[in-house]
């Protein structure tokens, strides 16, 4: 009787984080290191964004292009669509521009024949006048926009003295991000994404983000999508 030597092949997981913070980058490495059967592949840290700069999307595309024989692609969709979590709130790009970029990545992902596990954030609305992670006008109108969002969600109407062009910009940004997330749900429904997580960040009892969550819940229920999940927390 001959003893057969079984060689274990490590599962290769390519991970595109939401940005380069330790909780998104080093912590992922620490978690993967717990299981000796996992090989975690990450883009160079300098390609990823932070509080002050966007991710280098073209560089991340080239990195994915260079990958060979990966089993799983774990992807922050905010990174490939906007350049990160903060740019997803600040970006002035159109829905068409974002969709075209995402579709280019999707074609690349499909060519890797790997399971795709994707995460996208539902745009938050913070109750403060701090624009460090928001558009410039948040420093003056942040709390008022929060109240406008709260009242509109709670009562179906709202009054505000925030300039109409700022309200319009905010609503259009939310609508664009909502539509992109709807596209992601379609990718999950068609099987392109094996799993899609839509993450809720800094939620209050009422708000336009809460309305969007309810719409997503209704879509998921109507389409009976077991592979689309709504979870709390964007960084996690």
Regions found by a protein language model. Give the residues of each.
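An N-terminal assembly and electron-transfer interface module characteristic of large anaerobic redox
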Residues: 2-236
């Amino acid at each position: 009787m001959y003893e057969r030597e079984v060689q274990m092949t490590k599962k290769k997981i390519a991970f595109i984080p939401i940005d380069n913070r330790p909780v998104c980058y080093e912590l992922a490495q620490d978690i993967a290191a717990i299981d000796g059967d996992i090989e975690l592949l990450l883009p160079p840290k300098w390609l990823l964004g932070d509080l002050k700069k966007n991710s280098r999307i073209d560089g991340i595309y080239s990195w994915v292009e260079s990958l060979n024989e990966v089993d799983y692609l774990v992807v922050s969709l905010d990174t490939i669509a906007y350049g990160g979590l903060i740019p997803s709130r600040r970006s002035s790009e159109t829905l068409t521009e974002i969709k075209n970029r995402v579709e280019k990545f999707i074609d690349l992902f499909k060519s890797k024949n790997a399971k795709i596990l994707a995460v996208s954030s539902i745009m938050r609305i913070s109750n403060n006048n701090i624009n460090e992670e928001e558009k410039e006008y948040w420093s003056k109108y942040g709390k008022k926009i929060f109240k406008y969002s709260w009242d509109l969600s709670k009562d179906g109407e709202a009054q505000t003295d925030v300039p109409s062009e700022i309200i319009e910009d905010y609503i259009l940004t939310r609508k664009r991000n909502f539509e992109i997330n709807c596209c992601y749900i379609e990718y999950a429904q068609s099987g392109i994404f094996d799993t899609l997580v839509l993450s809720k960040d800094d939620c209050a009892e009422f708000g336009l983000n809460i309305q969007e969550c309810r719409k997503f819940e209704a879509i998921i229920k109507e389409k009976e999508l077991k592979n689309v999940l709504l979870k709390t927390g964007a960084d996690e």
